């Protein structure tokens, strides 16, 4: 059973079933850049349109093309393999002499734009991502589907971490527990994990820490959805500013806060677990602690704290920007919308219903980053 298969739906029962990614063209993602190139400097920014390949493969190909070490190629985020995606890469060329860019173009990738910049591309340096998703074999009443889409556009959705974060059948969370010295029995109890001499690479360890953190966040968000407060206010709420990681509060409920919440200027937040005190207090903190009071959650919390991670926050609510839809055929529905960095298109699909994803296990860990 996966970490996301039993998540509650905020807008009610599923209104459709469908299939996605029978071809890469059914899942298109375009990065929304956070800045314009300076036109000078020793970092060549390449906007690459790729098909059927993951980000790491393209980065390695660019390094080989430029004759530099792979660490000289940077990107803002990982993108799906089983998709058609557009994203920026930076290639460090101190002499400002680039090989023939046209030599990069093939059936897997095309360079659609290039420019020089005065610094390398940093992870997370993007405004967001624009998605165009095509759902096929759609089953469900058209009126109900369209009403659900309108509700999503108006009210937003829970800001779940998507299934890509957790690996096949949620295996990354079990692996994180094992890394912390535990194994979960079928009845939910914890047992000591067998001693392993295998050392994890840094990237593997980071992936498991992220999976553990994400699972705990989803459990808190699940509790808020179940009580109907995922897009509202509890006493002791820690608020997150829309479009940023800035957090403020808790503070007394006021008309001003209510207005900001209604216009999506602020969102309630949940914990990205680590060492330190929860930012929330009172009722909000009680919900968070209660949702994470079972033995596996406690073990994950303790493991994250011991690993040196610090308490952070993530918005509980997400609003897709510019949500549009059109019926290409009676059973083919195309969706288009933009999401902030670190948010998952699969969270939008979950509020619609059950979508079978042919590319489900051919994606990067941060497929929607």
Swiss-Prot record:
The keyword Nucleus is assigned to this record: no
Biological processes, Gene Ontology terms: tRNA pseudouridine synthesis
Coiled coil segments of this chain: none
General function of this protein: Responsible for synthesis of pseudouridine from uracil-13 in transfer RNAs.
Protein name (database record): tRNA pseudouridine synthase D
Broad enzyme group: isomerase
Cellular component GO terms, alphabetical: cytosol
The organism of origin for this protein: Xanthomonas axonopodis pv. citri (strain 306)
Catalytic activity: uridine(13) in tRNA = pseudouridine(13) in tRNA
Superkingdom of source: Bacteria
GO molecular function, one term: tRNA pseudouridine(13) synthase activity
NCBIfam families linked to this entry: PRK00984.1-2
Stored PROSITE patterns: TRUD, UPF0024
Family named by the database record: Belongs to the pseudouridine synthase TruD family.
Record domain TRUD: where: 156-318
Gene: truD
EC number: 5.4.99.27
Keywords: Isomerase, tRNA processing
Active site, per annotation: 80 (nucleophile)
């Amino acid at each position: 059973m996966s970490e996301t298969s039993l998540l509650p739906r905020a807008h009610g029962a599923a209104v459709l079933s469908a299939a996605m990614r029978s071809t890469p063209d059914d899942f298109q993602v375009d990065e929304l850049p956070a800045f314009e190139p300076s036109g000078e400097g020793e970092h060549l920014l390449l906007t690459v349109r790729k098909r059927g390949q993951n980000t790491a493969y393209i980065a390695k190909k660019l390094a080989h093309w430029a004759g530099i070490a792979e660490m000289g190629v940077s990107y803002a985020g990982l993108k799906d393999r089983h998709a058609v995606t557009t994203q920026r890469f930076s290639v460090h060329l101190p002499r400002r002499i680039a090989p023939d860019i046209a030599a990069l173009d093939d059936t897997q990738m095309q360079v659609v734009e290039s420019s020089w910049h005065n610094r390398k591309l940093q992870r997370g340096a993007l405004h967001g991502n624009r998605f165009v998703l095509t759902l096929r074999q759609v089953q469900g009443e058209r009126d109900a589907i369209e009403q659900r889409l309108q509700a999503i556009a108006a009210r937003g959705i829970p800001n779940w971490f998507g299934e890509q974060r957790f690996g096949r059948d949620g295996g990354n969370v079990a692996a994180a527990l094992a890394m912390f010295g535990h194994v979960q029995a079928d009845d939910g109890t914890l047992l000591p994990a067998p001693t392993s001499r295998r050392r994890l690479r840094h990237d593997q360890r980071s992936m498991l820490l992220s999976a553990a953190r994400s699972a705990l966040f989803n459990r808190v968000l699940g509790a808020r959805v179940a009580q109907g407060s995922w897009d509202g206010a509890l006493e002791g709420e820690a608020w997150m500013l829309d479009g940023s990681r800035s957090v403020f509060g808790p503070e007394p409920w006021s008309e001003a806060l209510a207005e900001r919440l209604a216009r999506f200027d602020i969102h309630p937040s949940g914990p990205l677990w680590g060492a330190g005190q929860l930012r929330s207090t009172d009722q909000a903190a009680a919900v968070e602690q209660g949702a994470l009071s079972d033995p596996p959650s406690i073990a994950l919390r303790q493991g994250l704290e011991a690993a040196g991670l610090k308490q952070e926050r993530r918005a509980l609510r997400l609003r897709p920007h510019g949500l549009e839809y059109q019926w290409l055929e009676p059973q083919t529905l195309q969706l288009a919308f933009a999401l902030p960095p670190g948010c998952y298109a699969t969270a939008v699909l979950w509020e619609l219903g059950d979508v079978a994803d042919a590319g489900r296990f051919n994606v990067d860990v941060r497929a929607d980053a």
